[in-house]
């Protein structure tokens, strides 16, 4: 294997034995020796580590790091640990152990580098469920703040404030894999409560939640916003028993920043046109040309395949 690693794919894991092998193979089978995959296991009690060690023997660019279980350590800290182990010049983030990735990660990287030619390296390219940035830049801006359940949104907000958040709309080329019942329960019901709790810890009020819901009641996720209003009392009681968080993330300023960024965003063709440039789609693989020239709402990955 080439010892010069250019790209680090950072992956956290906790008790994902039912999806981890298929998820990682979907990534490892589409990359070359310019890439490494860093998996930080957060003290799994299932067969995750056994599966990871077996895969590590099979794939020379997979590196597994085990942490002792700490119930107080949240995902932001685990993600930061994976980043600290990364050797690559560039980081690919938010690739998780319950995601199956279709073979277009390298095309996403090509898109990043084409944008980099006119924007420089000081930005985060935020695609559909996948993010990429220069390691030195991202490490100098956090990357993730401790204490936040929604660690990605916190980082996006801080980068958007300095004009370094570049959203890119494209066909989603990953799918969520089937989870266990307890994992589904956590994602659908418990995690939203923890998210609202931390929004309250950051200073958000019921009035602010109501305003955000009314301002976005016709958006695709209005049901989720309504659910957040309903669980507000439970989250409020939990928040009052915990230390407050800096008011830098969960507020209308963030929502307005992100809404503005996404309202001005589009496909790679739109992004290049806005900057007075023309994107050469021929640099992408044939199916990736479809993926990155269409919005996520226009076509599904199944139609592309």
Over which residues does each language-model region extend?
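Glycine-rich, basic loop-to-helix element that forms the pyrophosphate-binding segment
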Residues: 69-86
């Amino acid at each position: 294997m080439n010892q010069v690693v250019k790209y680090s794919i950072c992956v956290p894991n906790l008790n994902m034995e039912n999806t981890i092998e298929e998820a990682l193979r979907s990534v490892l089978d589409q990359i070359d020796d310019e890439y490494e995959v860093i998996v930080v296991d957060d003290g799994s009690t299932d067969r995750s580590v056994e599966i990871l060690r077996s895969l590590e023997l099979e794939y020379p660019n997979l590196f597994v790091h085990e942490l002792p279980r700490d119930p107080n350590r949240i995902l932001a800290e685990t993600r930061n640990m994976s980043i600290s182990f990364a050797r690559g010049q560039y980081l690919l983030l938010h690739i998780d152990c319950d995601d199956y990735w279709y073979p277009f990660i390298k095309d996403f990287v090509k898109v990043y580098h084409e944008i980099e030619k006119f924007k420089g390296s000081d930005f985060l390219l935020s695609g559909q469920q996948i993010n990429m940035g220069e390691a030195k830049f991202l490490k100098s801006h956090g990357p993730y703040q401790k204490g936040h359940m929604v660690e990605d949104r916190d980082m996006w907000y801080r980068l958007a404030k300095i004009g370094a958040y570049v959203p890119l709309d494209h066909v989603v080329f990953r799918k969520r894999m089937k989870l266990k019942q307890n994992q589904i329960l956590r994602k659908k019901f418990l995690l939203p409560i923890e998210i609202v709790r931390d929004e309250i810890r950051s200073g958000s009020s019921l009035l602010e939640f109501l305003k955000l819901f009314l301002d976005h009641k016709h958006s695709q996720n209005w049901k989720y916003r309504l659910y957040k209003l309903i669980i507000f009392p439970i989250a409020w009681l939990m928040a009052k028993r915990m230390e407050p968080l800096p008011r830098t993330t969960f507020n209308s300023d963030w929502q307005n920043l992100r809404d503005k960024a996404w309202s001005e965003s589009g496909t790679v063709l739109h992004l290049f046109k806005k900057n007075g440039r023309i994107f050469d789609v021929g640099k992408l693989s044939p199916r990736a040309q479809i993926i990155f020239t269409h919005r996520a709402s226009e076509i599904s990955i199944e139609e592309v395949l």
